[in-house]
Amino acid sequence: MAVTRLKPADPQIPDNIILSTVDAMLNYCRAHSFWPVTFGLACCAIEMMAAGGARYDIARFGYEVFRPSPRQADLMIVAGTVTRKMAPLVRRLYEQMPAPKWVIAMGSCAISGGPFVDSYNVVPGVDTIVPVDVYVPGCAPRPEALINGLLALKKKVINPKVALVK
């Protein structure tokens, strides 16, 4: 976050005044309190639930509030295989989320269709349905990988001008 410290004109003014833009402050707050929607499609959802458990504890980063409704969430973690029958529902959930909203594609099935990519009923990547901000590769990715993806998204939200390599 870009913070500018100015020398006070009056020595009576305390030195703990920080000047910044409203957008920078809002992005800083948003990056430290993602509210993911509870949404798992396959095996990767088990690893996503494990990341919320006591061993990995994503609560220490402020991301523990899994919301039951997309209208209360700002992050969708697509964890697992997206089928053609499920694709319109994924799109609808994304559209119901309030802005600003972000998407993490978790696992090789969500990223590219995984081992089922040649199937007639599997979508070859969730990025064909909704815009994806961060990709977390693996089959199934470990909870540490999801935490790494959340931290990468945090950097992207704090400084939106920096493009991350997908």
Swiss-Prot record:
Its main location: membrane. It catalyses: a quinone + NADH + 5 H(+)(in) = a quinol + NAD(+) + 4 H(+)(out). It comes from Moorella thermoacetica (strain ATCC 39073 / JCM 9320). [4Fe-4S] cluster binds at C43, C44, C109, C139. It is a peripheral membrane protein. SUPFAM superfamilies: HydA/Nqo6-like. Its cofactor is [4Fe-4S] cluster. Pfam families: Oxidored_q6. One of its GO terms (molecular function) is NADH dehydrogenase (ubiquinone) activity. NDH-1 shuttles electrons from NADH, via FMN and iron-sulfur (Fe-S) centers, to quinones in the respiratory chain. The immediate electron acceptor for the enzyme in this species is believed to be a menaquinone. Couples the redox reaction to proton translocation (for every two electrons transferred, four hydrogen ions are translocated across the cytoplasmic membrane), and thus conserves the redox energy in a proton gradient. GO terms for cellular component: plasma membrane; respiratory chain complex I. It comes from the Bacteria. This is NADH-quinone oxidoreductase subunit B. It is found in: Cell membrane. NDH-1 is composed of 14 different subunits. Subunits NuoB, C, D, E, F, and G constitute the peripheral sector of the complex. The keyword Nucleus does not apply. Its EC number is 7.1.1.-. Keywords: 4Fe-4S, Cell membrane, Iron, Iron-sulfur, Membrane, Metal-binding, NAD, Quinone, Translocase, Transport. One of its GO terms (biological process) is aerobic respiration.
